[in-house]
A protein has these predicted regions:
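Short Asp/Glu-rich motifs
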Residues: 106-107, 124
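Residues at alpha-helix boundaries and short interhelical turns
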Residues: 56, 74-77, 91, 108-111, ...
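Mid-chain, well-packed structural core segment of small domains
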Residues: 65-68, 72-98
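Acidic, glycine/proline-rich low-complexity segments that act as flexible tails and inter-domain linkers
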Residues: 1-61, 89, 115-128
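Substrate/cofactor-recognition hotspot
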Residues: 103, 110-114
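Short, conserved micro-motifs enriched in small and acidic residues
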Residues: 60, 64, 110-111
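Short alpha-helical scaffolding segments that buttress acidic/His motifs in well-ordered protein cores
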Residues: 44-48, 65-72, 100-105
């Protein structure tokens, strides 16, 4: 891959990252980046946002619900809360997220889904 293609993947990744997570979150991530995680931040911007999230086969809403289900199933609560907040930018509704968490309960276990529901209720209350 040429440097030009890498830059366009990074640029596209930053654009989508901002659309989904919001400028404030992305600016905080950039501000807090240092030599320890600089390579990692570039990796997630190009890999996750510039490649996976930029695909044209799924909507941002679909990707949001998939991401939420995986984060809930794996117990990644900090990222889960961030993506619950980001769902406002992807078009995923709280009722769709709740339905997604029902699938998590069946396929990943009730405790994983129960923890996710607690976080969702907190985020929902804070957004009122």
């Amino acid at each position: 891959m040429t440097q030009k293609n890498k830059m366009s993947t990074y640029t596209k990744g930053m654009e989508i990252r901002r659309q989904v997570l919001g400028n404030k979150h992305v600016e905080n991530a950039i501000k807090n980046t240092n030599k320890i995680d600089e390579k990692f931040q570039k990796f997630i911007t190009e890999g996750a946002w510039g490649s996976v999230w930029s695909g044209d086969q799924l909507t941002k809403r679909d990707r949001s619900l998939i991401t939420i289900s995986l984060l809930a199933a794996l117990g990644h609560h900090e990222e889960l809360e961030m993506h619950f907040n980001a769902s406002k930018n992807t078009g995923a509704t709280y009722s769709e997220i709740a339905e997604t968490l029902m699938h998590v309960a069946v396929y990943a276990g009730v405790p994983a889904s129960n923890s996710a529901f607690k976080i969702l209720k907190k985020v929902f209350q804070e957004s009122k």
